[in-house]
Amino acid sequence: MGSGDLNLLKSWNPKLMKNRKKVWETEQDLITEQQKLNTRLKEIEKERELNELLNESSKDKPETLKNDLALKKSGLEWMYQDAKLSDEKEDYLLGKKKLDSSILNQPATPPVRAATTISASGAATSISSQKKKSKLLKDDPMSKFKVTKQQRRTPDSTKKRAMSQRGKPLSKPAPDLDY
């Protein structure tokens, strides 16, 4: 009667194709993970060799050159490039400025670090970013509104306006409420 293999009916049977597929997929995942690990280990080894070479070569060099090498090594040198150069590129790309032949004929100069100032909070900010902020504040209508509001709040100007309008001074100016 029952000459069939009852193990084929069990979900855990290793002879079933779906179970073989699961095993094969996990093996492939392990193989790809091992390959990724090996490539990462090779990258780490290359970085170590580069660090050793840079350390040996920068022993007798000044501190600023060491900092430049460290930035190049870490891949962050693009963050510290001169903002003036990026502003010119931005203006050209936006169509605000056309390139002159004198600019095109100039040899490429290495980027110079932007001058920094230390603010009251102690954080170093670049001068160009301060110029951008001041330019934005001048163009911003809300900042103009706040400046005029500050000018109105000065006691001398409010008394003068009140006297010119009514002829007698106000005892206390009405407080401006900010919502």
Swiss-Prot record:
<feature type="compositionally biased region" description="Low complexity">
    <location>
        <begin position="114"/>
        <end position="129"/>
    </location>
</feature>
<keyword id="KW-0597">Phosphoprotein</keyword>
<dbReference type="GO" id="GO:0005684">
    <property type="term" value="C:U2-type spliceosomal complex"/>
</dbReference>
<keyword id="KW-0508">mRNA splicing</keyword>
<keyword id="KW-0747">Spliceosome</keyword>
<dbReference type="InterPro" id="IPR051376">
    <property type="entry name" value="CWC25_splicing_factor"/>
</dbReference>
<dbReference type="InterPro" id="IPR022209">
    <property type="entry name" value="CWC25"/>
</dbReference>
<dbReference type="GO" id="GO:0000974">
    <property type="term" value="C:Prp19 complex"/>
</dbReference>
<feature type="modified residue" description="Phosphoserine">
    <location>
        <position position="129"/>
    </location>
</feature>
<dbReference type="InterPro" id="IPR019339">
    <property type="entry name" value="CIR_N_dom"/>
</dbReference>
<keyword id="KW-0507">mRNA processing</keyword>
<comment type="function">
    <text>Involved in pre-mRNA splicing.</text>
</comment>
<feature type="region of interest" description="Disordered">
    <location>
        <begin position="99"/>
        <end position="179"/>
    </location>
</feature>
<protein>
    <recommendedName>
        <fullName>Pre-mRNA-splicing factor CWC25</fullName>
    </recommendedName>
</protein>
<feature type="coiled-coil region">
    <location>
        <begin position="25"/>
        <end position="57"/>
    </location>
</feature>
<dbReference type="GO" id="GO:0000398">
    <property type="term" value="P:mRNA splicing, via spliceosome"/>
</dbReference>
<dbReference type="Pfam" id="PF10197">
    <property type="entry name" value="Cir_N"/>
</dbReference>
<keyword id="KW-0539">Nucleus</keyword>
<dbReference type="Pfam" id="PF12542">
    <property type="entry name" value="CWC25"/>
</dbReference>
<comment type="similarity">
    <text>Belongs to the CWC25 family.</text>
</comment>
<comment type="subunit">
    <text>Belongs to the CWC complex (or CEF1-associated complex), a spliceosome sub-complex reminiscent of a late-stage spliceosome composed of the U2, U5 and U6 snRNAs and at least BUD13, BUD31, BRR2, CDC40, CEF1, CLF1, CUS1, CWC2, CWC15, CWC21, CWC22, CWC23, CWC24, CWC25, CWC27, ECM2, HSH155, IST3, ISY1, LEA1, MSL1, NTC20, PRP8, PRP9, PRP11, PRP19, PRP21, PRP22, PRP45, PRP46, SLU7, SMB1, SMD1, SMD2, SMD3, SMX2, SMX3, SNT309, SNU114, SPP2, SYF1, SYF2, RSE1 and YJU2.</text>
</comment>
<keyword id="KW-0175">Coiled coil</keyword>
